[in-house]
Structure formats: C-alpha cells, structure tokens
C-alpha cells in the first residue's frame, strides 16, 4: 500500500511539473516573433489560385471555380488532460458549420486527408457532408467518413501515385511516414465505420501521405507530418511546400527528402500550433513538441529557400505572376476521375 501511495504521489508530482512546464512554454512561445516576421501577404485576385490556412495542417485551395480542403480540423477539443486521459471526443458540427460560414465555404469539390489521426481527420466526414464534397484518403479515412454518415458514393479510397483530377487541380497522394520515434501512435488502421463519440486513440494512423496538388498556375506539396519515405518524392516537382514542423528531429535531412527533392524554393510551415486551444484564441506553438525558434534557425542556414508564413484564416494568392488579368471567378462542380 505504501509503495502504491508513493507511486501515485510521484505520478501526481510529475504531472504537476509537466503542467507547469507546459504553462511556461505557452507564455514564452519561442519562435513566434520569427513566424510573424516572415508573414506572406498577397491579396486574392479573380481567377487566382489562393490558399487559406486554418491551423494544424488544414489548408483550403481554390481558384474561383473549384475548391479543395485538406485536413480540415475546426472542432479542436480543448485541453491537454482529456488528450492524455484518452477521453471521448466527437466533431462539433455547429462549430464546424460556423467556421465554414466564416470562411465563405458553402461548397467544396473534395476533402483530402493526409492521415487519420484526429487532428487531421476527425472533422473530415462532417465537412464533406456539409459541403457536398468527395472525401479522399485511406481506408481508415473512409471509415471516418462512413461513421459521419457519408455515403460510399461520396468516398474515394486513394491509391498512392494515382492521378485524380478535380476541376483544374491534379492531385496525387504519395506514401510517406509519420513524424516521431513511435511512428505516429496510435498506429494501425480503422477497420470499421468510426461512430462518435469515440476516443482520441480510436483515430488510428491509417496510411500517411504527402499530397501533391498541381494547377496551371503552379504546384504545391502538402506534407503535413514531419516524417518521410526516403526517395518517395524523387521525380516530382512542386513550387511551394506546406511543411509540417512538429516533431522535427533532423531538419537538414527532412529538407533534403521533401523540399529539395521536389525542387521547391518556397516553404510555408504548418502543423506548429497548439491544437488543444480553439481557433478564436491566439495561436501558440504546441508545448514540448514544436520549436519554431529551432526551425527558423535551421532555415537561416538555407537562404536559397524562402520561408513564408500565413495568417490564420487569411486568404492569399499563391502565384501572383501567374494570375490571368481580369480572369472571371465563378462557381462550379468538379470532374473527378
């Protein structure tokens, strides 16, 4: 009994120290000033390919006719303790609907998911249902969609490397790896429709992908998690990389296997914010997991690569020089094949 009591006290003390450390890191937010100093702004123009970032690796790409949303995550269940205790969570549909309304998103052609952890995939089925979109991702992502009530006719399980055409977007999912020594726990697959509420750890990894999006105005690579499959991106090209920067342990190697392999000279860091905080609070780097200061220090050693950051929820034209003058903006569906 004494031993058990001692272990319990030790655990409580360690949790208390962790809470203090997390609170301190949240106040310090190392690297946040550098992030703000690299802000990229280019006002949206008719016909332009634009990007809007919504925290973590959630990214909206649209060109006035068609729109795709990658890794939507608006619910953001609050607090670290529920995450540690693996409590039950579920998509907050009213919050999702409000976020879509604020973002002027009433219709999407496709929702893409890079892997099936909750911070990338939990909201995906609901977003697809609310916007009339197809859901594209792994078999695990498909089961998240089914759990949200999305019919199979609106779900497409992707095969690595296959080209998928959505309007003027050409999309390819490339097999990758999750960041971190654990390989991305919880690993494994979601093998049946995931009904919610479900626990954090029910959102198993499934496949992990880089997503290449090609468009007549330019090409972007969405690399949401800071792992990589050696050589997987060889022979591909992207002008710009949206690069996940959580759990980076070897930045030079990471850049070689992502940014350098695709020949990009522009990088936008994503997946750095504390997603246990709601989007209506100021963003902070995720404590103990993200060191923006180290990322920017490392990028200073690669001056040929331009680091640009996006303001939360603010739309920006990605390739201003490629925008046709006076191009009309219109709404339309997608041809997917």
Question: For the regions a protein language model found, what residue spans apply to each?
Answer:
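Binuclear metal-ion centers of metallo-dependent hydrolases, dominated by the metallo-beta-lactamase
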Residues: 134, 146-163, 256, 260-337
């Amino acid at each position: 009994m004494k031993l058990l009591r001692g272990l319990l006290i030790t655990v409580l003390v360690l949790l208390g120290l962790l809470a203090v450390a997390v609170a301190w890191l949240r106040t310090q937010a190392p690297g946040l000033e550098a992030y703000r100093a690299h802000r990229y702004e280019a006002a949206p123009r008719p016909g332009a390919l634009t990007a809007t970032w919504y925290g973590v690796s959630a990214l909206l790409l649209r060109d006035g006719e068609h729109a795709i949303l990658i890794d939507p995550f608006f619910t953001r269940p609050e607090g670290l303790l529920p995450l540690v205790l693996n409590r039950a969570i579920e998509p907050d549909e009213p919050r999702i609907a409000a976020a879509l309304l604020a973002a002027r998103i009433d219709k999407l052609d496709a929702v893409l998911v890079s892997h099936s952890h909750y911070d990338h995939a939990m909201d995906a089925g609901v977003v697809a249902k609310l916007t009339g979109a197809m859901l594209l991702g792994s078999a695990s992502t498909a089961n998240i969609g089914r759990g949200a009530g999305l019919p199979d006719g609106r779900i497409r399980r992707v095969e690595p490397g296959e080209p998928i055409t959505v309007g003027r977007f050409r999309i390819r999912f490339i097999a990758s790896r999750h960041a971190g020594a654990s390989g991305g726990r919880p690993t494994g697959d979601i093998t049946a429709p995931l009904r919610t509420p479900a626990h954090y750890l029910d959102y198993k990894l499934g496949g992990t992908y880089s997503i290449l999006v090609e468009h007549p105005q330019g090409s972007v690579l969405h690399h949401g998690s800071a792992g990589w499959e050696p050589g997987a991106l060889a022979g591909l090209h992207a002008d710009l990389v949206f690069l996940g920067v959580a759990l980076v342990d070897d930045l030079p190697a990471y850049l070689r296997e992502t940014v350098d392999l695709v020949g990009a000279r522009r990088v936008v860091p994503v997946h750095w914010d504390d997603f246990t905080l709601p989007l209506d609070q100021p963003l902070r780097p995720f404590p103990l997991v993200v060191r923006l200061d180290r990322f920017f220090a490392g990028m200073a050693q690669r001056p040929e690569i331009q680091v640009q950051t996006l303001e939360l929820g603010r739309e920006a034209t990605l390739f201003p020089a490629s925008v046709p003058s006076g191009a009309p903006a219109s709404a339309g569906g997608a041809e997917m094949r």
